[in-house]
């Protein structure tokens, strides 16, 4: 099985490199120095030695030559082939639901859905390092309140990978969190998918992408989606993933506006009334969006009414964004179970988000649609940035013991 291609946004460090300067590439020496003994004018090569005789001076010259460039390049190539990686940095992007239909309730208590999921350019960065421990992973993060124990989906994903493959790698992980929690953006699910991808890289890609996708459904319904190529029609609980041929254009901008309050997914589903959901066939919505692009009518989210019951201020926020729209947004809708409101068509939020004190703690970010190639992980666009008033969540470190 071919190992996956690593992107520019990912850092790989081979083992057993004596020269730190060569840690990110091959050893290369530009000079080919030699050791010279004596002097002379005429020389001939024999077994790596240059021996020259001078009749006039009655002396012999011996010159020992080392082709250091070739020697060390060969050694570096051997190290690159045999060494594993010890550290890896990966981008962990979130997603939005361009439309979300709830089509029924299952006997197991879950709901069936049909949704167009799409990865976007807002995301976290996760740094993985091999740990000498053979019993425990160690997770740290820059945000207070994010669990760093085995309840975190990153740790669950690493435990799942070891269970499925029999590998025994444990890790130090640092999560640089930019995606807000309780936002309906799938940040935790993306982190879990990224951890599975990373564990597979450290193990020499012994599992296929299809296997990673299938395994991931055991710990979260949204996780399998991130093993698509970035745009997929998802059904079942979300774990049935079908890549779509025509992802939405990467140059179509959007703005994300999330109030500080979160929506409880469980509470939103508890208030859902199937008789009040849209009756539009989700395949009709999919065809409309993939063929004709984003429109307000096509961006249906059946979870909006119950989410607005849970958080009435979210309904007011959506209405104000629509009212302030001067043709900038093709559609304004809630992602997932909330509480993020998405405006497609412009990266700029309405002015009231900055001017009104009621929204002073609101998270705001511009974003664009994002995809990936098969056997490559997502890479962060250079232009991605956060634009909230505080820029990032509080920089409070917490580390598991």
UniProtKB/Swiss-Prot annotation:
Pathway: Isoprenoid biosynthesis; isopentenyl diphosphate biosynthesis via DXP pathway; isopentenyl diphosphate from 1-deoxy-D-xylulose 5-phosphate: step 3/6
Catalytic activity of the protein: 4-CDP-2-C-methyl-D-erythritol + ATP = 4-CDP-2-C-methyl-D-erythritol 2-phosphate + ADP + H(+)
Transit peptide range per the UniProt entry: 1-52
Binding positions (ATP): 180-190
Entry's Gene Ontology cellular component terms: chloroplast stroma
Broad EC category: transferase
GO molecular function, one term: ATP binding
Ribosomal protein recorded as keyword: no
Annotated EC: 2.7.1.148
Keyword Chloroplast: yes
Keywords: ATP-binding, Chloroplast, Isoprene biosynthesis, Kinase, Nucleotide-binding, Plastid, Transferase, Transit peptide
Subcellular location: Plastid, Chloroplast stroma
GO biological process terms on file: isopentenyl diphosphate biosynthetic process, methylerythritol 4-phosphate pathway; terpenoid biosynthetic process
Pfam families to which the protein is assigned, alphabetical: GHMP_kinases_C, GHMP_kinases_N
Family: Belongs to the GHMP kinase family. IspE subfamily.
Protein function: Enzyme of the plastid non-mevalonate pathway for isoprenoid biosynthesis that catalyzes the phosphorylation of the position 2 hydroxy group of 4-diphosphocytidyl-2C-methyl-D-erythritol. Is essential for chloroplast development.
Protein name, entry field: 4-diphosphocytidyl-2-C-methyl-D-erythritol kinase, chloroplastic
Organism: Oryza sativa subsp. japonica (Rice)
Lineage, opening ranks: Eukaryota, Viridiplantae, Streptophyta, Embryophyta, Tracheophyta
